[in-house]
Amino acid sequence: MSAEEKNIVRVFRAWKTAHQLVHDRGYGVSQAELDLTLDQFKAMHCGMGRNLDRTTLSFYAKPSNDSNKGTIYIEFAKEPSVGIKEMRTFVHTLGDHNHKTGILIYANSMTPSAAKIIATVTGQFTIETFQESDLIVNITHHELVPKHILLSPDEKKELLDRYKLRETQLPRIQLADPVARYLGLKRGEVVKIVRRSETSGRYNSYRICA
């Protein structure tokens, strides 16, 4: 397998995980996109010379139910390393198309200066970044990772009221936790974690993002 072929397979896996991530966050993704094969991916995103065209990998999705979430836009950076210029272009794309959330996926690295731009647009929209290697395997599909379900604000309130808890009494899940990043958790949000049990079938626990 050539170096370019290996790169195509790598990006294909990250592209698939990105679609699964968007779907799992509650945005509309077609079953055809989720089931796309490598050959179909090549036909769509590789030119006549069979080289990957990264400009065709971007996509956006609308929320399935909660319209207040706005649209989410995913872009695969054209350059291996993301600098100020590419990050600014990404920010402008989000603004021009009124996307509320943007995810920029890069191959190698992102400069500190590019990362600083993200903080300057907080409040306008949410920007997340992933390295391709983070998405080659969908961590939530691993058999040892229990199912995480984001609670709505009403469900969170009901949980706290039912058990007479304060937020500070809940166990924490860190923002940097791989599953928290996959789900796009924000501080103060609560996830229900469903684990299997040999005795009771399954049991639930809860964690708050901190």
From Swiss-Prot:
Keywords: DNA-directed RNA polymerase, Nucleus, Phosphoprotein, Transcription
Subcellular location: Nucleus
GO biological process: transcription by RNA polymerase I; transcription by RNA polymerase II; transcription by RNA polymerase III; transcription elongation by RNA polymerase I; transcription initiation at RNA polymerase II promoter; tRNA transcription by RNA polymerase III
PROSITE patterns linked to this entry: RNA_POL_H_23KD
GO CC terms of this entry: cytosol; nucleus; RNA polymerase I complex; RNA polymerase II, core complex; RNA polymerase II, holoenzyme; RNA polymerase III complex
Residues modified to Phosphoserine: S152
One protein family per Pfam: RNA_pol_Rpb5_N
Molecular function (Gene Ontology), one example: DNA-directed RNA polymerase activity
Function according to Swiss-Prot or TrEMBL: DNA-dependent RNA polymerase catalyzes the transcription of DNA into RNA using the four ribonucleoside triphosphates as substrates. Common component of RNA polymerases I, II and III which synthesize ribosomal RNA precursors, mRNA precursors and many functional non-coding RNAs, and small RNAs, such as 5S rRNA and tRNAs, respectively. Pol II is the central component of the basal RNA polymerase II transcription machinery. Pols are composed of mobile elements that move relative to each other.
Stored PANTHER family: DNA-DIRECTED RNA POLYMERASES I, II, AND III SUBUNIT RPABC1 (PTHR10535:SF0)
Family, per entry: Belongs to the archaeal Rpo5/eukaryotic RPB5 RNA polymerase subunit family.
Subunit structure: Component of the RNA polymerase I (Pol I), RNA polymerase II (Pol II) and RNA polymerase III (Pol III) complexes consisting of at least 14, 12 and 17 subunits, respectively.
Name of the protein described by the UniProt record: DNA-directed RNA polymerases I, II, and III subunit RPABC1
Organism (species): Schizosaccharomyces pombe (strain 972 / ATCC 24843)
